[in-house]
Amino acid sequence: MNAMRASLTGELGRMTLTRGRLIGYEFDRMVMLFSMVDGQREIPCAISTSAMDDLENLARCQPNQREAQFIRLRDRIEERAARKFAALEFEGNPPGIVLRSIDFQT
């Protein structure tokens, strides 16, 4: 586990995770797909639409407004994705980061 953590973090414990691509809204799963980059490796990520709505205190955003909503919230979303990445909280196949409302509760 320590070797894996070492490969996922940079020198002095700094994460090497940087902004990746905005992939788009997946209606069937009700998630916005995006990626983060660790060196040369792209990390698949997703955030639930309910999490984005909760962040903005909205009842429900329309599907055609999801991309704009993600862009407004992108810094906060990516910060939480980086935290889950540092904690090695991967899900799915291929392993990636999935953000839900609970991930933003303090």
Where are the predicted features?
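Acidic, low-complexity intrinsically disordered segments
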Residues: 2-13, 58-106
